[in-house]
Amino acid sequence: MVNFVHKLRKGLLLFSIPTLAIAQQGEEPLPISLDADSSSFDRDSNLVFFSGLSIAQGDLKIEANEAEATGLDFEMSEWIFSGNVRISIDSTIIRASTAEVSFQTHELSTVNLLGDPAVFEDFSAARAIDIRGGASILKYDNQARTLRMTDGAWLSEGSNEFRGCDLIYDIDEEKITSGSSECGEPVVITILPPPTD
């Protein structure tokens, strides 16, 4: 009986170590700050409205003339930003007319941006040339850290340019790939040789 209890304790200890390790690896989300010129709450629609809004969390910042949200609980909320939408993520700045933003577990999940076009610039001190791109529709996935450009997509790095109907830019890796080929348009890459002296 004593041997059984000893084995049971040992088994429970071994079972709890991975759980403890997983709990220690998980980081708490960073605090979210929200500043607005004005706000109002519509009890009938259960929506919150803002003007002159700025939301910041770590290296993420979202600014817009106006916004509406399904609530202030960032556990799971949907936001629509409109008018001079500007999103900063690390060294990347995205500009659009409107943006639909999803927050889950107190962190940015996805952003769907519309513009004529919606554009981005990725500035990096380690790189001599900025990367720029745009399309009518941009979709940012925070977990994958990718920016998908569809409908008139283009991306340039210096004098080199990519064009297509679906391009994907990996912010961390600074890589461009073509997405779906279902639109029937090929990816066109223009590479200009450096000027000769």
Annotate each language-model stretch with its function.
Residues 1-197:
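Mature-chain termini and adjacent capping regions
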